[in-house]
């Protein structure tokens, strides 16, 4: 009841207080302070979810930071790099190598051979297809300093919490540059929706080595896009080469965490081209302009060249090909060496990540997953049976239906910028990522790669409609709609995350008591 009362008071303040109905241009400091509070609360929630996971399984709140065990990211890759090799130290068994097709799960099961699950098998050696950036930046230095292995849950918390911070900073910079005429109550609701629907929370509930790749990629993508805005390549102000270099360095590092995120490097190229024209405009002509452009090109492209070249050399050292990341050599249920494309599998991902309407029940937490395989024939890997479409987890995503009206409200220059800048980051990259997961199956954590970017695009359309086309009464309706969307986003995401958490450990009775607190009418 107290939580409901606090939420009601917050909504009352957002709808009535003049300072919260003022625009960002009128109250920039206030919005900055509120952003800091929302971010701090989000990080506290991340800590709480991690502690719940830890205690529910071991009865201890924190991991052993002097542990001598780990997984293929925290230990096996660390040991391999320490030994000066790219293959893992453990050798495949002769029985495994003797199989006609060791990538066939049924053959491995029938023969009863031992093998490392979800590792790569190539040319008689084990490898890992997970990105090397977390290893080089955290796990390997920690091992060299302490002789121990950094624990996985705390690593996921570290990467995820920093990602939450930089997502807020990105949104603050986005507002500062493009949304100064939008009221604070809309912006506050938007930040709540953006953070709630980012998908990073699922990683704290089940922090395994998969989630290391997911959260580290999330961190460096948010950091890179924030620095890209701060660099001034678009919007007012001069171009900052230091921030630009940091942006491409971060986005390139995200690829070394999770190769799928290379799409955001590609999406950044129109930003870099636009910034190049801005940086060199009126400064020189002919060859003199080339000399002026060299520092910009180095800051913008050199990190991509160095990091991309390093990844290609790493690929070649393992698989004899610069462009082979090795995913097809995985020892899992699916034989990726013989994988066949099926449009039905693509549809499963699009439906569950974007459209699936969650189940509503009169039992806590009231909102439940509604995953569907769409009656597809054949085997489709399901890692986590937890689904709720982005349209319902972030109702402002419906803003895309106003794209035609927003397009008509823009002049030619703004249309060009929207096509070159907003479309690649918020629409094309998320859509391609969604398309690409058909081969891997469904896991709710995958939304961490694209969710907030897709949500931002819908919000941007609504902001433009508010500023350009809405009358006074329509603006009031939009303000209320954003607040309602924030409440729905908070409720739906909280319910889905609660349903994703395990409740069969030390805290089973406490989870039951929590549910009874909300079911106060029973």
Feature locations, PLM:
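Short hydrophobic alpha-helices at membrane interfaces in multi-pass membrane enzymes
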Residues: 227-252, 291, 299
